[in-house]
Amino acid sequence: MSITKVHARTVYDSRGNPTVEVEITTENGLFRAIVPSGASTGIHEAVELRDGNKSEWMGKGVTKAVSNVNSIIGPALIKSDLCVTNQKGIDELMISLDGTSNKSRLGANAILGVSLCVARAAAAQKGITLYKYIAELADARQDPFVIPVPFFNVLNGGAHAGGSLAMQEFKIAPVGAQSFAEAMRMGSEVYHHLKILAKEQYGPSAGNVGDEGGVAPDIDTAEDALDMIVKAINICGYEGRVKVGIDSAPSVFYKDGKYDLNFKEPNSDPSHWLSPAQLAEYYHSLLKKYPIISLEDPYAEDDWSSWSAFLKTVNVQIIADDLTCTNKTRIARAIEEKCANTLLLKLNQIGTLTESIEAANQAFDAGWGVMISHRSGETEDPFIADLVVGLRCGQIKSGALSRSERLAKYNELLRIEEELGDDCIYAGHRFHDGNKL
C-alpha cells in the first residue's frame, strides 16, 4: 500500500524547543511520529537541522526541516509509489534525496520523522504490532520476546542539570525484578526515597528535577550522589536487586587531553584536571565501593586510546554513546579497537530506522550488548518502547519515573508486557545479552 499524503509541522519537545512531527496517510489511516533532540550531542551525530534565526526560538526553529518534509520528501515518496512495507527502500530514497554523509541537507530530524511514521503505517498494513514489525525488519527472534531492564536516570548532573556535579547521569537498574511491572515498582520506590533524602540533605529545592526527570541537588561529587542512591536502595530493602549505572558524558569536560570534573566553575584550576589514567583510577575507586554494573561514555568521543585501555581493566558494561553515535563506521572502529562492549542506540543520531536496525545487528554480531536510549529533549512518542522489544536489546534508558515524556515509554512497555503474557521474559541480570535469551 502506497502513501497518499505526507505532512510535517512544528511541535514542541520536553524542553519547550521546537521539533518535527510528521504525519503519513495511507488507506489504513493516519500515522504520526515526533522526533526528539539531545543536549549533550556528539559531534559525529547526523545533523539535526535548525533554522539558526536568532530572532525566532533563539535560533532553534525547525521550519527548514518541516519544509523539507512537505516540499521535498513528501512529494518524492508519493511519486515513488513505494509500499509502506518497503522500509529499506523508503529510507534509502530519503538518504539519496539528502545526498550528504550526515543528512545535513534535509536534516536527520526531517528524515527520521518520516522513517518512523512509515514503520507505524507498515505495521498497520500487516495487521501486527509495531514491535513485531520491527522484529521482522531486524530478523530478530520472537519466541519469546524480551522485555528490557529499565535504567532509570534518578539523579541528573552535567549538561542536564544545574549544580556543580560533572557527571551527567546516575541510574538505577532493577535487575533483580521478576518482571518489568515489578521493576517499575522497585524503581518508583527507590526514586521517591531518593527525593526525600535529597531534600533532607540539600534543602527543598533538591527535589527539583532535571531534563530527564531525575533529582538535581547541588551535589559536588559522584561519591555524594552514589552514597545517597545506595542509601535509598537499602532503605527499600533492594540491596543486590537494584544496581547502579553512570553516564559521565565527559566530552563536555574534556580539555587539552585532560578531564575537568570542575568544568562548571568558570575559573577551574587546570592543575586539578585529570589525565586519562587518573580518570581510570577514579572510575576503579567507584567500582570497588559501589554496586555499579554499567559505565557509559567513560571517556571523550575521540579519545580512542583511553577507551581501549580502560576496557581491558574492567568487567562491567562499558557503553559507547558519543564515541559511536549509532554510526556504522565508528561502531566498526570501536569494535576493531576493543573500546567498549555495548552500543547505546539513539534513533536520531543516525536518522533512519533501517540504519538503526543495521547498527544494532552490527553490535550484536560483534558480541556487544545494545541499550536503546531516549534523548534529553523528548516527546510523548513511545516509539523506542517498541524498538527495544522488537530488537531484543534487553535494556533501555528513558529517564526517571517522572515527567510524562519519560513515562510514555515505560508505560508502553507495561502494556506490551501485559499483552504478551507468557510469550515474553524479563531480561533481569542478563540485560546485556537480551538478544541471546
UniProtKB/Swiss-Prot annotation:
Alphabetized InterPro entries for the sequence: Enolase, Enolase-like_C_sf, Enolase-like_N, Enolase_C, Enolase_CS, Enolase_N
Which pathway does the UniProt entry assign to this protein? Answer: Carbohydrate degradation; glycolysis; pyruvate from D-glyceraldehyde 3-phosphate: step 4/5
The entry marks the following residues as binding substrate, namely: 160, 169, 296, 321, 373-376, 397
Cofactor(s) needed, names only, are: Mg(2+)
- Describe the reaction catalysed, as an equation: (2R)-2-phosphoglycerate = phosphoenolpyruvate + H2O
SUPFAM superfamilies recorded for this chain? Answer: Enolase C-terminal domain-like, Enolase N-terminal domain-like
Q: Report keywords, A-Z.
A: Glycolysis, Lyase, Magnesium, Metal-binding
Residue numbers annotated as active site:
212 (proton donor), 346 (proton acceptor)
Annotated Mg(2+) binding sites = 247, 296, 321
Would the keyword Lyase turn up in this protein's UniProt record? Answer: yes
Instruction: Write down the Pfam families for this protein, in alphabetical order.
Output: Enolase_C, Enolase_N
- GO cellular component annotations, sorted alphabetically? cytoplasm; phosphopyruvate hydratase complex
Q: What biological processes does GO assign it? A: glycolytic process
Q: What is its EC number?
A: 4.2.1.11
Indicate the enzyme's highest-level EC class: lyase
Q: GO molecular function of the protein, one example?
A: phosphopyruvate hydratase activity
Entry-linked PANTHER family: ENOLASE
- Similarity-based family: Belongs to the enolase family.
Please state what the protein is called: Enolase-related protein 3
